[in-house]
Amino acid sequence: MSRHMRAPRFDPRAGFHAEGKDRGPSVPQGLLKAARSSGQLNLAGRNLGEVPQCVWRINVDIPEEANQNLSFSSTERWWDQTDLTKLIISSNKLQSLSDDLRLLPALTVLDIHDNQLTSLPSAIRELDNLQKLNVSHNKLKILPEEITSLKNLRTLHLQHNELTCIPEGFEHLSCLEDLDLSSNRLATVPADFALLSSLLRLNLSSNQLKNLPAEISRMKRLKHLDCDANLLETVPPDVGSMESLELLYLRRNKLRVLPEFPSCRQLKELHLAENQIEKLGAEHLQHLQAILVLDLRGNKLRSVPEEMALLQSLERLDLSNNDISSLPCSLGNLHLKFLALEGNPLRTIRREIIAKGTQEVLKYLRSKIKDDRTNQNDSVPETAMTLPSEARVNIHAIATLKLLDYSDKQATLIPDDLFDATKTTLITSINFSKNQLCEIPQRIVELKEMVLDINLSFNKLSFISHELCLLQKLTFLDLRNNFLSSLPEEMSSLTKLQTINLSFNRFKVFPEVLYRISTLEAVLISNNQVGSVDPQKMKLMENLNTLDLQNNDLLQIPPELGNCVQLRTLLLDGNPFRVPRAAILMKGTAAVLEYLRDRIPA
């Protein structure tokens, strides 16, 4: 907003202030001049112990250059300037803010996160135009009541402070859409929060909440509710009536039972990991028709209801670390991209099937549905034929599972007789794991028109031959626990590959060719020596939802990685970088990505 300087704010002695007293830390005049033109001033990361007076008075005092140059052109007239609307003074050492803050009434954005503030000035009430206020990562113990006077405020970030309570009158922030109170010391949430009728996103994670007010259900526009890492033992049944809710986070609490969700027909993600839930019934699932992500890991579930198969939109299901002994075969009819089952006492699915990943488990479950539909009392008994090489191949397994299995033989070569035995049979899966293979069998190319997944883990492969790159229908490739340090460029022809496991190899850089395989959904490259990743290229991998970089040599995580919003699971533990801190990593992928985005240079 360009305007002439208003008379009441003009100080005729302004040009002499600097000579009369110490003005404190200085700001380059070039920055101030640019700010008068653009209306924006960024002083982040300048080691400031206080805000220079010239910042507060940027639209009041006569600029220094006005005293030095009296022949202004029409584009340099100091009195025809822009009010400061955006002020960023984050990542400094500020312990307090002056009441002179009131001299910037046009501010719409004030970012003072990552300082040492213990309080906010009462003059903040005079910032009538303020729309976004970021005071996160400070040392605030209380909030001034004056903050509730900011009627135009839309975004308020207060995470990572020391707040124990919320001032009365918060409900007056009628325009507020995004409120982050995570990582404080709150024990209660005022019932009046329900009057925040415009709120779309509410983050209460990492506090000390033992319950939520039932009135929270009156937030009819709320889409994102995060209550992770609290002390919740129950959730008000009224939460199930929140019609606009899309994301609900309740991880790391003390929940034993779940509410029903009769009106949550927009709910896309339900995160319930690390609770004490013992039962999941049809009543909990029947209304979740839009659900994409269901995270139940680390609970005490003993069974999975058949009704889970009704969730036809479900893409990611995490049931790991429960007490589940069997799965309903109907799960095989789901269109899952990710299914986690580790840490369960499953008796009906072999470990090697689970190790091969989601699609193999679903395929196995579907095969069991067929078995159930046809009486197996007179089925063909499992038979085997002996090859001249003394290898044994299960003909029944090849015919029914379409699996060519020559695993755990400690073999250095795959016998030709094994390939000969499959000439008249459709093979979609190959398992040559746990051998001593130094190269990929050349005859694997004979199956290029049919094979979808290959397991070559636990061998001695030091390179990938071109034969593998010809299997263009491949969707799953397991190469973990080999001696690989690079991948050939020809692998870019694997245009249907969805999952690749490269863990426990010798990679020092993230394989460049993987950036060009746009179909990849999961890249597992933990326990290598990877020193860097390219966030710009990673962002172009639009289908990538799982990236495991644990236990590598990453000295820093580029902030731009936070722009890879397609990631649902990002694992970074066990690397030598210092930031993000372990506390951030523990909060999960969404928190890590947000942390990184906040540190992208303006």
Curated annotation (Swiss-Prot):
Gene3D superfamilies: Ribonuclease Inhibitor. Residues 1-26 are annotated as: Disordered. Signal peptide: none annotated. Residues 8-24 have a biased composition (Basic and acidic residues). InterPro entries: Leu-rich_rpt, Leu-rich_rpt_typical-subtyp, LRR_dom_sf, LRR_domain-containing, LRR_R13L4/SHOC2-like. The modification Phosphoserine is found at S71. The keyword Coiled coil does not apply. The gene is Lrrc40. The lineage of its organism: Eukaryota, Metazoa, Chordata, Craniata, Vertebrata. LRR repeats lie at residues 35-58, 81-103, 104-126, 127-149, 150-172, 174-195, 196-219, 221-241, 242-266, 268-287, 288-310, 311-334, 336-356, 398-421, 424-447, 449-470, 471-494, 496-517, 519-540, 541-564, 566-587. It holds the Pfam family LRR_14. This is Leucine-rich repeat-containing protein 40. Keywords: Leucine-rich repeat, Phosphoprotein, Repeat. The keyword Secreted does not apply.
